[in-house]
Amino acid sequence: MTRSAVIATTLLVGLLLLANRLDPVREGLNATYYAGPDWSLSSVAATPREYPSTERLYEAWKGAPPEQFTVSWAGSFLAARDGAYTFSTVSDDGSWVYVDGKLVVENGGRHGPVEARGTTPLVRGVHAILIKYAQGGGGIQFDLSWGRDGRPVPDTAARI
């Protein structure tokens, strides 16, 4: 093997390893839990999550969560095709969904389980997503769903 072939092979392997580490949809979401009502107190846990959910709150707090807390899930998802994507939350209390920095779902305030949805056009490719949830006391619920052109998107396409 010539010296230039060795260099080219080494560079290719290095680029492949780097691409694997930078894959924005490989790791899912990063969940950060805060023991306060406005994401300002220090976080109590930050863990990767495949899907935003309140199911693991007891795990994050190693027991019952406080009466008031906030959670943010941040990461990326893959839009497999161009289209109008609809995001929906059902939350007890407030929730917000941002796609590529744009507010798509606003379900804020203190309330029982309420659904809110929003639609945004997306081109095929990877998009940033930030999901926020605020619990102000009482019942705890958060559910996220999304779809393209009126049809649900399979979980495997989301990788969030």
Predicted regions and their residues:
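Acidic/polar, compositionally biased interaction segments
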Residues: 1-160
